[in-house]
Amino acid sequence: MKKIIALLLAAVMVMCLFAGCASSGGSKVIKIGVFEPQSGDNGAGGKQEVLGIQYANSVKPTVTINGEEYKIELDIQDNQSSTDKAVSAAQQLVADKVSVVLGSYGSGVSIAASDTFKQAGIPAIGVTCTNPNVTAGNSHYFRICFLDP
């Protein structure tokens, strides 16, 4: 239950804080990248995180920033619980021009994709990655959960 609440709070926080918006066919959109495993060893946990993020988006599908309303669009990429596949999933999020990234379930894939997000200037928020190396020395990767001892 605490994990779901943390996911919801993270998603709503991102939806409310980020004003890096794109225009798509006249409508104003904020794209949020969801960098989670939906297959592989951590697929079950990643799917739960995706469900929490999708639920938050269904509850709060738009956000108002400075009096203007923006639609929140989720760009979900499966990093397949693999450090090899994580980089290509991260590159796809960069190519899709997301404003921020949420994820990943599994610290190894977060570490593997970190440089891709850093080079693109995209902030990432680790929802459940607990390895201190995910955020150590990074000005672009943040976390909302505890650290492994």
What residue spans do the PLM features occupy?
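Extracytoplasmic ligand/sensor domains, especially the bilobed periplasmic-binding protein
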Residues: 95-149
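Extracytoplasmic "Venus flytrap"
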Residues: 33-54, 77-83, 105-108
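Short, low-complexity disordered leader/linker segments with a strong preference
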Residues: 1-31, 65-68, 95, 119
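Short, solvent-exposed loop/turn and secondary-structure capping segments
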Residues: 43-47, 87, 114, 137
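Structural motif
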Residues: 70-95
